[in-house]
Amino acid sequence: MVLKTELCRFSGQKIYPGRGIRFIRSDSQVFLFLNSKCKRYFHNKLKPSKLCWTAMYRKQHKKDAAQEAVKRRRRATKKPYSRSIVGATLEVIQKKRAEKPEVRDAAREAALREIKERIKKTKDEKKAKKVEYASKQQKSQVKGNIPKSAAPKAAKMGGGGGRR
């Protein structure tokens, strides 16, 4: 017999039939929580990514590395197949594959050189505009007009976060 399990919207844990608390928001969105603890934390607007027992925290901090590796290994075993890609026929792809590495490297270097030149050109244009703008600003500025320094920021209030 297969049980239909659902996931808690806060903790990410499995909820078996007959368990959990269903919450329907005023915009008709349905939330299913594992227990009152998850529901309470959700309503208090606590972030599940900051609570070390939730699935989101564990995923962000790479705690379930062994399970992830198993999943990746399963996904990696795909059967090879030859099929043309949009914009390139199978013959073109095979021709590129059969191409010598020296020719491929030369083409890549040429493309990189062109891109670098384009970037350098745009940077030079930006510099020229910046210099032009700065010179206009200096001309328009009156001698007695000195910009005020920014007011110092007030210290932040509140706790430092930490574990809950």
Curated annotation (Swiss-Prot):
Entry keyword annotation includes Ribosomal protein: yes
Molecular function GO labels: mRNA binding; structural constituent of ribosome
Tagged with keyword tRNA processing: no
Gene3D superfamilies: 6.10.250.1270, Ribosomal protein L24e
Keywords annotated in UniProt: Ribonucleoprotein, Ribosomal protein
One cellular-component annotation, GO: endoplasmic reticulum
Highest rank taxon of the organism: Eukaryota
Biased composition (Basic and acidic residues): 117-133
UniProt-annotated stretches for the region Disordered: 117-164
Subunit structure: Interacts with the cauliflower mosaic virus transactivator TAV to form a TAV/60S complex. Interacts with REIL1 AND REIL2.
Family of this protein: Belongs to the eukaryotic ribosomal protein eL24 family.
Known function: Might have an extraribosomal function in reinitiation of translation.
Protein name: Large ribosomal subunit protein eL24z
Originating gene: RPL24A
